């Protein structure tokens, strides 16, 4: 997933502290869990709180981040807006996705019932310019139907069942499903994207390409906490962008 550009700054040079490789006794080696926590602290210190997922503000007509405020999404409408944003951000820059989201928000189309009530062709016209707009319009219609089906009971559903439900929607893959679960529905699941794979390779020499292997690596070595997962994922993307990785 591609995200909005932020102001540039010096990228932290994360030192390698593989205890055994550096000559330390094995019992003093830095564990994966400890290293992940240390890197997280260094990234927060360098880049600050990220405040994902940005949400549309009616007054300013801009997408606003909310660093340090983990009460978002505050309602079903904001949760749905994030779901829409996840779909729009597939395979395009965040700038393109943001423009399409604004085009939906301005005439108040950014609503589950409204989207459910218009045709795929009409929806495609609103998001034209976002890339793959016809395909995404069909996905948006399908994921909207799924959301309307689940919105009254998703809080009681297990992460696995909820994930499977969104994966059943054509056009929703693992990265998109996990983005929906983590940011829209506040479920503790770690998102794996290309930046995360490069992060694992650079800092842990972990080169697995399998999505779930990478997700297991992160989840097994971090406290299973929604806030931590949200911030860490956003920070990894910021790290990748600053390093041009």
Give residue ranges: language-model regions.
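N-terminal polyanion-binding entry modules of DNA glycosylases/AP lyases
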Residues: 1-156, 224-228, 232-245
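Hydrophobic secondary-structure block in the mid-to-C-terminal portion of proteins
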Residues: 196-245
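Catalytic DNA-binding helix-loop module of base-excision-repair DNA glycosylases/AP lyases
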Residues: 85-88, 140, 144, 157-206, ...
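Short alpha-helical "patches" and their helix-cap loops
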Residues: 96-110, 153-162, 194-200, 210-218
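Short, well-structured alpha-helical segments that form the helix of a local strand-helix-strand
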Residues: 115-119, 123-124, 162, 166, ...
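Short, conserved alpha-helical segments within structured domains
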Residues: 80, 119, 136, 158-162, ...
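Alpha-helix boundary/interfacial micro-motifs
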Residues: 102, 125, 136, 148, ...
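Short amphipathic alpha-helical surface micro-motifs
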Residues: 22, 65, 172, 215-219
């Amino acid at each position: 997933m591609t995200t909005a550009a932020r102001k540039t700054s010096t990228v932290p040079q994360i030192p390698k502290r593989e205890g055994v490789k550096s000559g330390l006794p094995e019992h003093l080696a830095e564990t994966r869990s400890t290293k992940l926590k240390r890197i997280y602290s260094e990234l927060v210190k360098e880049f600050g709180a990220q405040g994902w997922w940005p949400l549309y503000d009616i007054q300013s007509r801009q997408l606003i981040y909310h660093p340090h405020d983990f009460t978002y999404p505050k309602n079903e409408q904001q949760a749905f807006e994030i779901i829409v944003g996840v779909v729009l951000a597939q395979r395009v820059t965040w700038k393109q996705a943001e423009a399409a989201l604004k085009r939906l928000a301005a005439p108040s189309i950014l609503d589950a019932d409204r989207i459910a009530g218009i045709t795929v062709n009409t929806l495609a016209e609103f998001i034209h310019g976002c890339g793959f707009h016809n395909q995404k319009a069909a996905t948006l219609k399908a994921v909207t139907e799924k959301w309307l089906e689940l919105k009254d009971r998703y809080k009681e559903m297990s992460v696995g069942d909820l994930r499977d439900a969104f994966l059943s929607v054509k056009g929703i893959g693992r990265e998109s499903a996990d983005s929906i679960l983590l940011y829209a529905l506040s479920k503790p699941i770690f998102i794996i994207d290309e930046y995360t794979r490069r992060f694992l390779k650079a800092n842990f020499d972990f080169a697995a390409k399998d999505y779930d292997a990478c997700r297991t690596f992160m989840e097994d070595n971090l406290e299973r906490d929604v806030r931590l997962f949200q911030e860490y994922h956003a920070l990894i993307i910021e790290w990748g962008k600053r390093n041009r990785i």
